[in-house]
């Protein structure tokens, strides 16, 4: 592997920490869901909707966020999004009803859109053989979710109010938005910014972008869904306290986060598609374990899924800049949007199934079946063609 460009390490540090701050703000509502449930007397479906809504905007907003990063640069875009995300976070601290929480939850989802900005910003600092590792390290910003899940309940107890927690995280978001603007810099590039119509044309004519979106729907969507819903699931299914459930969820997030750069490094060495074969096969088996109602079996399944999802996230984002070097932000926006949507629907489905059957088992059966479907798509789109001929971006019209 070649030496990094001068300034690349600094850029990676600032993008990763900014992503962690954004992800922490994005995850606050889910982290404090047990508190809101008790405060407002929510049903399982109402609680699931509250958890899922921030994920929706955080998903759909990634496509335009990625386009903005490609056009105006990640430095400006990331700084602005960090500053704007602080507004709904602070407003939730002032809210006093479930309805207000839902509306503000839509806007706090803005923090989740910054993921696409960071991928575009980071990828431009590294050569193709470094991008899997670099984006895997950037993806460790997922630890922001762990900070929210574990830190928010602890801070709420320390301050004696959940409202103060939102004010604290809003202040951190503002601080890091200013820091990013002052000290982070865009990589020098000769690539001419693309127009909106050109961005849309890339998405329409590149089926590979949609295949990668499907894969990220499974890997990152699975990660987000479990990260935001585990506190509720553990409390409902296994009668854990909010603090214990938060600690276990933080462990899940931490493991998935640490495995993401490993997935990127393995993808640099062996190819992202080959790594994804193992990931999807593992998820199909681990989903079955998580459907079991016994704590030890569930724990093995959840920790195994954390490792597999982390590896998968790193592998997918090795493939994005590899096949779309000029449109990384735009394609990342699409792929990231699907990944976020993969985190939006499962909590809703789990809530409905819990109310209908009294269990979450059927939801994990769906996870296993979906992973098997992705396994088949990966084989026919990537590996089968690799056996026939050397795969190149031109094979997909990229």
Where are these regions (language model features)?
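Conserved MFS/SLC helix-loop-helix module at the cytosolic interface between two early adjacent transmembrane helices
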Residues: 60-98, 267-270
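Cytoplasmic helix-loop-helix junction between adjacent transmembrane helices
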Residues: 104-141
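Helix-breaking motifs and short loop linkers at transmembrane-helix boundaries and internal kinks
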Residues: 41, 73, 94-99, 127, ...
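Glycine-rich segments within core transmembrane alpha-helices of 12-TM secondary carriers
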Residues: 132-150, 336-346
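Juxtamembrane intracellular "pre-TM" segments in multi-pass secondary transporters
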Residues: 1-6, 185-213, 396-398
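C-terminal transmembrane helical hairpin of 12-TM major facilitator-type secondary transporters
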Residues: 270-316
């Amino acid at each position: 592997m070649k030496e990094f460009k001068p300034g690349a390490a600094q850029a990676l540090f600032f993008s990763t920490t900014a992503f962690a701050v954004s992800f922490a703000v994005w995850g606050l509502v889910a982290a404090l869901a047990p508190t809101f449930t008790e405060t407002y007397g929510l049903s399982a479906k109402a609680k699931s909707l509250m958890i899922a809504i921030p994920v929706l905007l955080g998903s759909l907003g990634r496509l335009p966020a990625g386009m903005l990063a490609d056009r105006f640069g990640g430095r400006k875009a990331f700084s602005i999004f960090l500053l704007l995300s602080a507004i709904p976070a602070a407003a939730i601290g002032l809210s006093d009803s479930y309805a207000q929480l839902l509306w503000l939850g839509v806007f706090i989802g803005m923090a989740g859109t910054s993921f696409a900005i960071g991928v575009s910003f980071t990828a431009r600092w590294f050569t193709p053989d470094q991008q899997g590792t670099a984006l895997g390290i950037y993806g460790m910003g997922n630890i922001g979710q762990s900070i929210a899940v574990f830190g928010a309940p602890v801070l709420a107890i320390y301050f004696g109010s959940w409202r103060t927690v939102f004010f604290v995280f809003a202040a951190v978001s503002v601080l890091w938005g200013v820091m990013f603007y002052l000290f982070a810099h865009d990589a020098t590039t000769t690539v001419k910014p693309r127009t909106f119509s050109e961005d849309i044309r890339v998405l329409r004519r590149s089926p590979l972008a949609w295949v990668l979106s499907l894969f990220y729907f499974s890997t990152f969507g699975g990660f987000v869904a479990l990260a935001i819903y585990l506190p509720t699931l553990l409390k409902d299914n296994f009668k854990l306290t909010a603090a214990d459930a938060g600690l276990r969820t933080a462990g899940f997030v931490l493991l998935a986060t640490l495995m993401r750069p490993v997935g990127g490094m393995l993808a640099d060495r062996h190819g992202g598609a080959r790594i994804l074969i193992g990931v999807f096969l593992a998820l199909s088996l681990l989903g079955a374990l998580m459907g079991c109602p016994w704590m030890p079996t569930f724990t093995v399944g959840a920790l195994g899924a954390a490792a597999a999802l982390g590896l998968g996230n790193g592998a997918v984002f090795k493939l994005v800049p590899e096949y779309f070097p000029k449109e990384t932000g735009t394609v990342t926006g699409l792929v990231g949007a699907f990944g976020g949507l993969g985190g939006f629907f499962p909590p809703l489905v789990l809530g409905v199934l819990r109310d209908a059957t009294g269990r979450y088992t059927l939801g994990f059966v769906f996870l296993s079946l979906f992973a098997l479907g992705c396994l088949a798509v990966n084989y026919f789109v990537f590996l089968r063609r690799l056996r026939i001929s050397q795969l190149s971006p031109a094979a997909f019209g990229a």
